[in-house]
Amino acid sequence: MAEASKYKKLTPIDHVLIRPEMYVGSVDTSSSSMFVFDHEKGRMVWESLKVNHGLLKIVDEILLNASDNIANKGGRMTYIRVHITEAGEITIENDGAGIPIVRSKEHKLYIPEMVFGHLLTSSNYDDTSQNAVAGRHGYGAKLTNILSHRFSVCCRTKGKEFHMSWHDHMRRATAPRVSNVDPKEKNLTRVKFLPDYERFGLDANKISHDMKRVLHKRIMDLAAMFPSIEISLNGVPFAFKSFADYAMLYSSPSSSGEMPPAPFVYESRNGAIAFIPSLTAGTRRIFGVVNGVVTHNGGTHCNAAQEVLQSSLESVEKALKKDNKVIDTNRVLRHFMILVFLVQVQPKFDSQNKARLVSVPTMPRVPRQELMDFLLRMPFLEAHVNTVTGQLADELNKEMGAGRRMSSKSLISSITKLVDATTTRRDPRFVRTLIVTEGDSAKALAQNSLSSDQKRYTGVFPLRGKLLNVRNKNLKRLKNCKELQELFCALGLELGKIYKDAEELRYQRLLVMTDQDADGSHIKGLVINAFEALWPSLLNRNPGFISIFSTPIVKVRLRDKSTHSFFSLKEFHKWQKTHGNVSYTAKYYKALGTSTTAEGKEYFKDMDKHTMRLVVERNDHKLLDSVFDSQEVEWRKDWMTKANAYTGEVDIDRSKKTLTVPDFVHKEMVHFALAGNARALAHAVDGLKPSQRKILWAIMRRSGNESAKVAQLSGYISEVSAFHHGEMSLQETIIKMAQNFTGGNNINLLIPEGQFGSRQQLGNDHAAARYIFTKLSSLARILFPSEDEPLLDYVTEEGQQVEPNHYVPILPLLLCNGSVGIGFGFASNIPPFHPLDVSAAVRSMINGEAAKVVVRRLVPWAVGYQGEVRRGPEGEFIAAGSYQYYVDGRVHVTEIPWTLSIEAFRDHISVLASKDVVQRIADYSGANHVDIDLELTNGAMTTYAECESELSLTQRIYINGTVFSPTGVLTPLEGDLAPVLQWHYDRRLDLYKKRRQRNLGLLEAELAREKSTLKFVTHFREGKIDIVNATDDSLAKTCSKLGMVRVDDSYDYVLRKPITFYTKTSLENLNRKISETEKRIDKLKKTAPVQMWLDELDRFDRAFEEHENTAVATILKERRVNPPTGDVSRNLQQPRLELEEVKVSSSGGKSVPMRVRVRKYVPPPPSKRPHVGQSVGGGGGGGSVRSSAAAVVAHVKAEKKAARARSMQKMLLDVVARQVARVLPRLPWFLF
């Protein structure tokens, strides 16, 4: 019966309430990037906003009901009015045909009652109808009703007026009221509703600022779709005379203020389409609307609109080819934003959410010649012509020796790393091949493994590290890349030349030979990218010019000494599953240097077996652009999100002899991208990156906790944890994990012994790894209890078990220490928080508070910080340093933001000194404290805000996190850290349950063993067991008869004891141990998992508080005994801002107070500096702005200089006047 109780049948209303995402999309607020209107700039801007798509959808349903009425021929519609109150109640009203106020003959209900209060009621079920409306399924307005606290409707049609209200999520309603009104009064439909904001995870009766902007934009889109209708929001109409007016709002100026050409707009009966140019290339964006429905996920109409632009650009490309110009259409596309607003009959969407159009659209017939002429006029077109001519290209060609044949002697002297083919003669039986290897060790393998005959036609050239990404043809960067220059020179390539045949080159094939790991895939990709970007025709017309040489990644040796080679881990894992009972030894080849010369000779003996020919199609440059172009961030994010979500193994089919670019990108290059993200981005639960996790695991498994030299420790960690990325990077990570200065780690998992860096350079001033020592910190062992280790999931590398997939510390370490990382398409910047506050947050969640509530109280903090954290104007956090400003112009700086190094602060002050803002600096700072005296020019600062800004004493702290979730999925958090708290809470609590169960099992097994031992000892002492004359078998039978438990299938735990074990003292000890074990079992049974957690949190809190007190005391002790004193300037001294109110849960749950509080945002006081005539924006208007401190000082100096000049002039005039007055009386009268 218990199983049967799990099955439930819900009412349709309850189903909507329990599973709203099925009908209206997600009801969780998440960060989404979209266009919104910026009132200050007067145009659309692309911003990341906190959007609740479910709330947007229920408002949209009523808006679309109103807009659908436009197509109703029963009466002309003139307006749609939307009003949103401060209390969050929304009213949408429209005139027009109106809803018939009659009872349905079939259902005996009024039509408005059915339309707004009964699911699956609609007038749009006739699929033969030619009306272009948004409604289709009969859910629409009813979903809004169900997801609202209250919902009312007023309909006036043909002299009758209908009123009805619903509440309790459409479960209860008032009786419909129908009255007669003046038939001359206009028809109307008015819907008023109050959404259930708490159901959408929002504050009660409150629409956020971001959601107001999103709704404003949504209503604006509707106004653009129907410019003949007056559509207004809160009494303010959107006055679009045409679609072109709306499209102009998407035009944005360049960084220099220059405006792009006006958009290309075409309107027809089927809708409107606009191509909006931008002077700077960006991510391709398309915004589509169908019958008023915003299709957030695009669809067939967006694809068709892009195809219109693409085909027109191809026509432009053909026209320019006549002038020997080859245009890169893919890059030109990035200069355009596309709007497509369609009017469609019977459109079909992917779901009730209507986020994507799936039916074939009827597109406006855009005049192609007009569009082509428009494209040819674009000012940025010339910048994307694929030519590399010019002085710089000529210089590079000259440096590389391009365009002339070079002798082997010249090549040897100019390219020392090149081992050239021994003959220059051509032989049709052999393809002259240049092998490009990853590093010198791979070069040695190739060179030592090639036969004498192969060396006649095969050269070898090693590459060091990562190649330059030349996707955007940045020849200035290429000029500084010696490796690529030498590679091009070895091949005889010339920049700017179009190659039709590889026979024009010194080598007819480039064989790329790299390690079989993610970094090797990246190097292959960069080589392909370089040649496709600079010489696309060479690859298009010569399939296989670039070929990939593959070597085994795993070799298996069976008992019969036969071997199997596997070229991918996917292939090896598949073999393992089908040969589970086979005994074998596996050797992993992570690098080419692992292969012996004998193995290398085996590879090159049959080169064709190991070689795949790369085939490059004409349109493959689009995909390579998306991967390597720095501006295609959003594409890479989407690519990584899909790749990370895929749970299977992806790899190239090495049995095929050809490789396409899409296969290489999606099946091999993707491994580098995924590995790059795994290395750079932290795990949400333990806050660690793989290298940090390997270090922690390896150090914790060492016997004892003796200090070890960092350089030696890195070698040990590499060996035991299968680390493959160089010991230098490992040493840097070890050093960073031990740094404990303010702004380093709030919790340093390793102890620093030596110079591990300081606030002077934020840790970059550490000593070399061979001079410094470290060991595990005591806090690390508290955070990562040893009892957890048997319960964790571990990673297997090279056939051995290494570190856990992720740890589950007692606190979310990600929040304690923060995390910064730049991955492939994703980046993360999570600030640190006070560990005791994180502990308080966890305690609050244990007490029943929601993570969303708790996380709002967390404030970024660095242990030892002596400043304060404020709220910024946009809701962000601001770290503010502290200072004393004295009336004589002296400033004593005692703290700077923890994200700023003391050296960087000094450099900034030096710049101000060069502008005469600062007259003197005296730095008394140490490793972990700030103590700096400044003398400022009189009048340079007039308010405390100017002082903080000019002296760089404030830094904004933004939260932009991307982490790996507990299931390993890459998850962007944007500014919301609540998921981190929740994921950690769930995993840690689950671990305590498992640990409690395991410990109970161990204690009960121990008790059973002790009781069995007691039985045996008691029987022995009573003379019932004769050990002297017994055999091993008879003793085992005796133990079995006594009901003793077996341990490891034997009774050795009692039979192998010394004779002293059977003494009276031992018996007493055994009874005492049994009593203690029983007490431990009883105590553990009474201890809930959360209590186990609280006990360990108590232990951590005590230890950390002692650690923090010591750190702070050290900082205060290092300060000067006699700091500066004097009268403080009231105008320039920092104010003590009020603390923000603490947000507590309204749904119960006891809040645990936190130590760090954020101070309220207060607008800075107005500047008292004089205007110095700097014009605003470079345009007209002749305005002026308050100047910087440097400009004010310069202005004051100029004024003083001018005043001195005027004084001198006045003095000279006075002297002359006195002399003239003395001489005049003595002159003869006739002179006058």
From Swiss-Prot:
Indicate the residues that form the catalytic site.
Answer: Y771
Which cofactors are required for activity?
A: Mg(2+); Mn(2+); Ca(2+)
- Which residues are involved in binding Mg(2+) 2? D515, D517
Residue numbers for the site described as Transition state stabilizer?
R770
Annotated positions for site Important for DNA bending? I822
Q: Give the similarity note.
A: Belongs to the type II topoisomerase family.
The protein in question is named: DNA topoisomerase 2
